[in-house]
């Protein structure tokens, strides 16, 4: 996975979009780059919010079909885009682009304050991490998705 990790790092450096690649069978994280502090230091650490992460990953994975892209707002309030990786008709992994916000929406600060308080997070540190979450316009993602959607380099069929 080292070459794929390097490719993901180059992609993140070029456009700032966090990337994760998860095993389609067991959900193991195979590659991750640019994951947000709010996720790595808060959401994926606390048992309640971590369960939301797992449920969100599982839900978006269930939405994926060959040559389709799915967008989903996770239970912790952030967006992910999922892309299936199909090799010889086997769904082996999912590429997750995110976590991010759409520029067209204003993050619900009260939702995040409430979440921090309910889960016992340091509210100031949590909100500071929230401010670091990147924003992408739907238009810019519309331009990016066709270049990285499951095309010939991700979907291989038996001849």
Regions found by a protein language model. Name each.
Residues 1-10, 93-159:
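Juxtadomain coupling helices with adjacent low-complexity linkers
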Residues 1-77:
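Structured interaction and signal-relay segments at domain junctions
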Residues 14, 21, 84, 141-143:
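Generic structural microfeature
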Residues 26, 86-95:
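A glycine-centered beta-loop-beta connector
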Residues 34, 43-47, 85-87, 106-112:
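Surface-exposed beta-strand edges and their flanking turn/coil or helix-capping segments
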Residues 80-88, 99-100:
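A short, hydrophobic, proline-anchored segment that marks a local hinge/packing element in signaling
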